[in-house]
Amino acid sequence: FLAKKVGKQLASHLAKKQLE
């Protein structure tokens, strides 16, 4: 299932948001 891939993208997205 793609949950792992989506989870990784989501974590990366959230990390980028926190860096701003």
Swiss-Prot record:
Expressed by the venom gland. Pfam families: Cu (PF17563). The modification Glutamic acid 1-amide is found at E20. GO terms for cellular component: extracellular region. GO terms for molecular function: toxin activity. One of its GO terms (biological process) is defense response to bacterium. It is found in: Secreted. InterPro entries: Cupiennin. Keywords: Amidation, Secreted, Toxin. Belongs to the cationic peptide 04 (cupiennin) family. 04 subfamily. This is Short cationic peptide-4a. It comes from Cupiennius salei (American wandering spider).
